[in-house]
Amino acid sequence: MDARATIPEHIARTVILPQGYADDEVIYPAFKWLRDEQPLAMAHIEGYDPMWIATKHADVMQIGKQPGLFSNAEGSEILYDQNNEAFMRSISGGCPHVIDSLTSMDPPTHTAYRGLTLNWFQPASIRKLEENIRRIAQASVQRLLDFDGECDFMTDCALYYPLHVVMTALGVPEDDEPLMLKLTQDFFGVHEPDEQAVAAPRQSADEAARRFHETIATFYDYFNGFTVDRRSCPKDDVMSLLANSKLDGNYIDDKYINAYYVAIATAGHDTTSSSSGGAIIGLSRNPEQLALAKSDPALIPRLVDEAVRWTAPVKSFMRTALADTEVRGQNIKRGDRIMLSYPSANRDEEVFSNPDEFDITRFPNRHLGFGWGAHMCLGQHLAKLEMKIFFEELLPKLKSVELSGPPRLVATNFVGGPKNVPIRFTKA
């Protein structure tokens, strides 16, 4: 065993295995212990390759802003166990990536492909969507209010609003949104028994990997026809932009276009719904914060940022060292794998006072919920806008909100958040 592997096994298992993320009272104390005792250290647990775990805000930023040294392309950017990793490579010709998305690229390739939609996702561009987003938000708020005082915020509201927004932006017909919801949940839910299409107590790693591959294939089959359609009949949507984009004078290969579609459809939906659910949990547990937001709508953008920080819907991304280097006094060797922990970075006491508290007055809020560096979330401005509009529409119509039962969290070390948020509310 590598002498640098110093993290106690029970701590390492908590922060590496998906199950640890299903309980905030387990995962956050483990991260605090690491920040205090071993902020950057290597871990070995059965079934996973050795990895460094970066838990400090400064280290996650330092690694994230150096794509030339810490690569997304060299190894999988998703934390897989060894069985999943082997299966993914077996179906992709030895490549560590199942889809050729932005998150699996390094500059200059990443720069070129990200540049195709960069302007579309800038604040000035997405303002044209505001009227339509507000209409969708108003319908979603009314849907919630129609439950007449009690509902599950996630399954009755939060899953559908961001899905409708991002599918509208992408250009997916509204009738196909249920399919997109299922595929998105399958994409992020391979570790979650409740999200499995196969009615089995628990999938083996190989079964989970096969289902993931099947989900990708279904996504690609669905999107293939749209590329042809948008080239002959372009519309004002992201699919039309990508279908008609060229690099070096040629249309983009279908595998890259489809991967782009999948990335927008999945990341643009699940992260926003998770953060919205986190916001409702925070407001329910802290009624004084709800009163503040209702009395001063100017605080709603801060509410949005605090929800992203506090919920941290992206749990981890992986990097691979391209050369020997040093971070926080630790010798990182070429080929070493590093897990970047965004939930831990977002609760770093050196950056955030009272980091475990949900505080919508927190400013500045230097959270890393949207990542950092070249791979910082492309759709962050759209996500912030849709959450801002949603709470602008919802809060004036609420007198109070409280949890009517314990929230349940998704068990995932990749992307996820609240799975169920049962609430009781009174209308204003």
From Swiss-Prot:
The protein's required cofactors: heme
Binding site for heme: C377
Cellular-component GO terms for this entry: cytoplasm
GO molecular function, one term: iron ion binding
InterPro entries on file: Cyt_P450, Cyt_P450_B, Cyt_P450_CS, Cyt_P450_sf
Pfam families in UniProt: p450
Sorted UniProt keywords: Cytoplasm, Heme, Iron, Metal-binding, Monooxygenase, Oxidoreductase
Top-level lineage group: Bacteria
Enzyme Commission code(s) on record: 1.14.-.-
Location relative to the cell: Cytoplasm
Disulfide-bonded cysteines: none
Enzyme class, broadest EC rank: oxidoreductase
CDD domains assigned to the protein according to its UniProt record, in alphabetical order: CYP142-like (cd11033)
Function noted in UniProt: Catalyzes the hydroxylation of alpha-terpineol.
Protein family membership: Belongs to the cytochrome P450 family.
Entry protein name: Cytochrome P450-terp
Species assigned in the record: Pseudomonas sp
